[in-house]
A protein has these predicted regions:
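Glycine-rich loop at the start of a catalytic domain that most often binds anionic cofactors/ligands
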Residues: 90-99
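Divalent-metal (often Zn2+) His-rich catalytic cores of metallo-beta-lactamase-fold enzymes
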Residues: 232-235, 241
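Flexible, D/E/H-enriched segments
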Residues: 1-73, 98-211, 215-219, 239-314
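Catalytic metal-binding/acid-base residues of hydrolase active sites
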Residues: 84-86, 234-235
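Beta-strand elements within well-structured catalytic alpha/beta cores of enzymes
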Residues: 76-82, 190, 224-232
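Short helix/loop capping segments that flank catalytic or ligand/cofactor-binding pockets
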Residues: 89-90, 238
Length: 314
C-alpha cells in the first residue's frame, strides 16, 4: 500500500483483494467471500472513502515523520531487517536467515508499464526512475555479524553479491527510495525468510538473532552510530488489530517473551513480516520506544488491508 496512490487505496484494492490468497486471523487459508461473510455488520463503514482517505493521510504523515527522524540521527550505518519475497531467493534455495556483505547492492531501473495497470505502476515506484542504483553496504560490519553469528552457533547464509539480473527486494529498495532518498548511507541487509514454508524463521529465533546482533554491534572495533529498521508491516493482508496491539504493547514494554511466544501459524503472508520487528526490538532493548504511530488501514468490507506501524527507539 505504501507504493499506491490515494485513489488506489480508495478503489483499486477492492477488486484485487478478491483475487489474492488470504489467511484468516487464526492463520488458516480462507477466501475473500468467507471473510466478507464473517465480517461484522459495520465493516463497510470502516472503508468509506473519507475514512480511507484519512488513513492514507495518517500513513504518509507517519512516513514523513519517520524520514525526518532518520535524517536527524546522523547514522553511520543502517541495518535493514526485511524479508525476501522470491526476489533474490526462490524455492530452489531459501535460507531462513541471510546477511548480505557485498560492497554495494543494486536496485534496478523502472520499466514502462501501461497507465491502466495501477498495480504495476505502484510496483515500479520501488525501483529507480532513470537508471540502476548501486547503494553502499557496510561490508565489514556485515562480515563481523556473519562471523560472530557463526561463532555463536547461528547458521546464517552469507550473500556476497548478486548476479547480473538480480536486484534488492522491495523491503530494502523502499528504505533506499523513501527514507534514505538522496543519501548514500551504508546499509547491512538482513534477509529473513518470513513468508515461505517449510523453514520460516521462528519468533523465538528472531529474538535470539536480535540479541546477538546487539552484542555484535557493541563488540565492533570501530566507533559507529548504528541504526536498525524493520522493513515491513504488522498484520496483512487481513488486518488483525488484536495481534498488532499485542505486538505494540510488547514493543513498548520490551516484553521479548511475548514476542518469542507468538504463534507462528498466525504469522502468515504479510503478517509474517512481524518477525522483522521482533529482530529490531530484540536488538534495541537498551533503548526506549519514543514514538509510534499505528494505522489499521482497512481497504475492503471484508476487512482486508494492512496494519501500518511506524516507530522509533532511542
Amino acid at each position: 500500500m505504501l507504493a499506491a496512490e490515494r485513489e488506489d487505496w480508495i478503489a483499486s484494492f477492492r477488486d484485487s483483494d478478491q483475487l489474492m490468497p488470504l489467511y484468516d486471523r487464526s492463520g488458516a487459508r480462507t477466501t475473500y467471500a468467507e471473510l466478507l461473510a464473517a465480517a461484522p455488520r459495520d465493516s463497510a463503514d470502516r472503508v468509506t472513502e473519507s475514512k480511507m482517505a484519512a488513513a492514507y493521510d495518517r500513513t504518509f504523515a507517519a512516513v514523513a515523520e519517520l524520514k525526518r527522524q532518520i535524517d536527524a540521527t546522523s547514522l553511520d550505518v543502517l541495518i535493514i531487517a526485511g524479508d525476501d519475497q522470491h526476489e533474490l531467493f526462490h524455492d530452489t534455495m531459501m535460507p531462513a536467515l541471510a546477511i548480505y556483505y557485498g560492497k554495494t547492492i543494486r536496485n534496478a531501473a523502472q520499466q514502462d508499464v501501461p497507465h491502466e495497470n495501477w498495480y504495476g505502476r505502484a510496483q515500479m515506484q520501488r525501483l529507480e526512475p532513470e537508471r540502476d542504483a548501486h547503494y553502499p553496504v557496510h561490508a565489514n560490519l556485515a562480515l563481523h555479524f556473519i562471523e560472530g553469528l557463526v561463532a555463536r552457533d547461528f547458521d546464517v547464509c552469507a550473500v556476497g553479491g548478486l548476479t547480473a539480473e538480480q536486484h534488492e527486494g522491495h523491503a530494502y529498495s523502499y528504505i533506499h527510495r523513501t527514507y534514505l532518498e538522496g543519501r548514500h548511507l551504508p546499509v547491512v541487509p538482513l534477509l529473513l525468510n518470513t513468508y515461505y514454508p517449510p523453514n520460516q524463521v521462528t519468533p523465538q529465533r528472531c529474538v535470539q538473532f536480535g540479541r546477538h546482533l546487539r552484542e555484535l554491534i557493541a563488540s565492533y572495533p570501530e566507533d559507529l552510530r548504528v541504526g536498525i529498521i524493520a522493513s515491513g508491516g504488522l498484520s496483512h493482508f487481513v488486518v488483525d488489530e488484536e495481534l498488532d496491539l499485542g505486538v505494540i504493547t510488547a514493543l513498548k514494554t520490551k516484553n521479548l517473551d511475548h514476542l518469542a511466544r507468538l504463534d507462528p501459524k498466525r504469522l502468515q503472508a504479510g503478517s509474517s513480516e512481524i518477525r522483522g520487528w521482533i529482530v529490531a526490538a530484540a536488538a534495541a532493548t537498551d533503548l526506549d520506544l519514543q514514538w509510534l504511530e499505528y494505522i489499521p488501514a482497512y481497504r475492503t468490507p471484508a476487512l482486508t488491508g494492512i496494519g501500518m506501524a511506524f516507530a522509533r527507539w532511542s
